[in-house]
Design a protein with these regions (language model features):
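N-terminal beta1-alpha1 cap of cysteine-dependent amidohydrolase-like domains
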Residues: 1-96, 100
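Catalytic nucleophile loop
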Residues: 98-100, 121-140, 326
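ATP-dependent carboxylate/phosphate-activation module, predominantly the ATP-grasp catalytic core
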Residues: 415, 435-501, 505, 512, ...
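C-terminal and late-domain segments of enzyme folds
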Residues: 1-37, 56, 143, 147-240
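Peripheral (often C-terminal) accessory segments that flank ATP-dependent C-N-forming ligase machineries
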Residues: 555-642
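Conserved ATP-binding module of the ATP-grasp superfamily
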Residues: 370-372, 390, 394-397, 408-443, ...
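ATP-binding N-terminal substructure of ATP-dependent carboxylate-amine bond-forming enzymes
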Residues: 240-349, 627-641
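A conserved helix-loop-beta module that forms one wall/lid of the active-site cleft
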Residues: 337-407
Length: 642
């Protein structure tokens, strides 16, 4: 069922449905989808079922409006007291149900009498509410006083049980009611504002509307939220608001993550930040894209984090997303989601599968994805020695739960293995050992929607492993490809499916074999290394933007708000990254690089200290048209004096 909640589908005085905010075109598209392009059977549901004169005038007016809007119909029927007994068959045969405007309590009573809530179960057409009809779609209907005497009547019921099609409570016809009074009480300041301390209402001018698809509401046009005794604008004309509350954890680090907040806010999401920095010390770009902020003393103190989320939930209502997009906080994100019943991300019971390298193996196997052989350090020195004898040296020791190259070591023989165990005698059980595989390190980076479908894909290539860059203090050079190789896309998608991941940015690492390896594959095949359920680190998201002329931060935000990509992708190119070291003497200066690459140079800046071990001290990013140009860029930028 597709639902439209309107004050009125027309602007005042217009003879047809308004085209503002794309309303008429959207309704026509929904009707065509519901009927297969055939004229719909329309059922109007009266708000005054016993007032024949009023009901007949509404039938004529709505019929004229529908036809003036260019919508052909098979039939238009009014459901009121006269044919109430036929309600089941009328609803069953309708393609388009319109809940008419009028007196909310009167219509509400009639809807219950005909048992409309039950009749709508399984309805797959279009339902449109007008004024009272929209208000009665809510689970709990806010029936604010409207007629003389209602505001001062102690028996008048402001809260009614509705159709439970939405939890959105509307105060329609903003232009007409903003300064209206009932029984000498101002409707907003004296009635709605006080009632909003424990509720949240939305109000907009005629021409605005809410569309609900697959249970997800989106508001179109200028609108205001009334809550906690005040009114604030939540959406502007010709823009959308998604009724979502997103808690973004540590939005100030990495430094580019404010773009995620900006993208979500642009989509009408309420962006609520939690960090351990004073608000005034947050970057201006971030502050401008936060709707609220809660400072904790320590982001690792779960009790403080729990209180922060609880405070937002009390103030803003149901929390829809909790996200950091940061490997370090994945476990805490999952725990908070689980404790607050936020179902849009990974829960506690699945976190080990994406954090522990030993657990990852099980899911790789489910997807038929080859991986390096592995043994847990907890098996002990003797068994790890036997493992190394079977696979051959070198072997790689790495934390079972860890990110980046931290704690990773290449062990070349029994002597180095024994020394490693001696040095790690207190925590060797926290490590795993894997056979050493030679090949090209590549990544499959993608954003997936809630259906497990990729809405954006990218491939980056890392000719020198991060472990080697860190341990040898090398320059960092890697690139983003123009396209994702078909075989990599296939194994990347299979991996995501095996891990059961949806609604996420993913960064999956693979080795592309440089020779045939028994049990793993042929030269050129891909072998699973590890999964990272977050965006790639460092400047890679920016490189993806440059490579594909898009905005991956916005695409992620589109996934959050709309479950689809709305940001287009342009013509693709190669984008290369060079991270130079302050400790090295280069033949070509900073200015030489800028002069040589000119407009091809997309970015050059100092790398944050926290990232410099991996990425170098000075970053240069260039957009080029061929792999040969990328290699020439690397050679020129990293050439040193002998």
């Amino acid at each position: 069922m597709t639902i439209y909640l309107t004050g009125s589908p027309t602007r005042y005085g217009e003879p047809s449905f308004t085209e503002d905010n794309g309303f008429l075109a959207d309704v026509k598209a929904s009707l065509a989808k519901a009927t297969g392009g055939h004229p719909p059977r329309v059922l109007l549901v009266s708000a005054a079922p016993d007032d024949r004169g009023f009901t007949d005038s509404v039938l004529k007016g709505m019929s004229d409006c529908i036809h003036c809007s260019g919508i052909e119909t098979e039939s238009i029927t009014m459901l009121d007291r006269r044919n109430a007994s036929q309600a089941p068959s009328l609803v069953e045969n309708a393609h388009w149900i319109i809940l008419c405007g009028g007196h909310v309590p009167t219509q509400n009573k009639f809807l219950h009498e005909i048992n409309l809530k039950s009749l709508l179960q399984g309805f797959k057409g279009v339902l449109m509410g007008c004024s009272a009809g929209s208000m009665n779609c809510a689970g709990t209907v806010y029936s604010h006083p409207e007629l003389p005497g209602e505001a001062v009547d102690p028996e008048y019921k402001r809260w009614l049980k509705g159709l439970e099609l939405t939890d959105i409570q509307l105060v329609p016809h903003l232009d007409q009611v903003r300064y209206a009074s009932v029984d000498n009480l101002r409707l907003f300041e004296d009635i709605a504002f006080p009632d909003s301390w424990n509720h949240r209402f939305y109000t907009f001018r005629d021409g605005g509307y809410v569309k609900i698809t697959d249970g997800k509401p989106t508001l179109y046009g200028e609108a205001f939220e009334i809550s906690r005794g005040a009114m604030r604008r939540v959406c502007e004309e010709n823009k959308t608001y998604s009724f979502m509350n997103l808690i973004f954890i540590s939005p100030h680090f990495p430094q580019t993550y404010w773009h995620f907040c900006a993208g979500a806010k642009a989509n009408g999401v309420n962006v609520l930040g939690i960090a351990d920095t004073n608000y005034e010390n947050l970057p201006l770009e971030l502050r401008q894209n936060l709707d609220d902020y809660y400072k904790v003393d320590n982001l690792e103190d779960y009790e403080q984090m729990y209180r922060a989320v609880a405070w937002f939930a009390h103030k803003w209502g149901k929390i829809d997303w909790i996200e950091s997009n940061n490997e370090y906080w994945l476990e805490q994100d999952a725990r908070l989601r689980t404790d607050f019943n936020v179902t849009t991300g990974i829960q506690t019971d699945h976190i080990a599968a994406i954090k522990n390298k030993s657990e990852m193996k099980k899911y790789y196997a489910l997807g038929g994805i080859p991986t390096a052989r592995q043994i847990k350090g907890a098996e002990g020195l003797a068994k790890v020695k036997a493992f190394a004898k079977k696979t051959g040296y070198p072997i790689i020791a790495k934390p079972d739960n860890g990110m980046g190259a931290g704690g990773t070591a290449k062990l070349r023989d029994d002597k180095e293995l024994e020394a490693w165990f001696k040095e790690r005698q207190n925590d060797f059980a926290l490590y795993v050992f894997e056979e050493f595989i030679t090949g090209l390190l590549v990544s499959y980076d993608a954003i997936y929607n809630s259906k497990g479908e990729p809405i954006f894909e990218n491939n980056s290539v890392f000719p020198t492993p991060v472990m080697e860059i860190v341990h040898k203090n090398l320059d960092c050079c890697y690139w983003t490809n123009k396209t994702v190789p078909a075989k990599l896309a296939a194994i990347g998608r299979r991996t995501v499916k095996a891990f059961g991941i949806k609604s996420r940015f993913v960064h999956l690492e693979f080795f592309q074999l440089d020779r045939d390896r028994e049990g793993l594959g042929k030269k050129g095949d891909y072998v699973g290394l590890e999964v990272n359920m977050r965006p790639p680190g460092g400047y890679t998201p920016d490189m993806m933007d440059y490579a594909h002329q898009t905005d991956v931060f916005q695409i992620w935000a589109d996934m959050v708000a709309f479950d689809e990509a709305r940001k287009p992708v342009g013509e693709s190119a190669y984008v290369g990254y060079v991270g130079r070291r302050d400790s090295r003497r280069y033949k070509h200066s900073h200015q030489d690089l800028l002069d040589r690459y000119g407009q091809a140079m997309c970015m050059c800046e100092r790398v944050p200290y926290a990232l410099s071990d991996d990425l170098g001290d000075m970053a240069y990013i260039a957009r080029l048209q061929s792999k040969a140009e990328i290699e020439a860029f690397f050679k020129y930028a990293t050439e040193e004096y002998a």
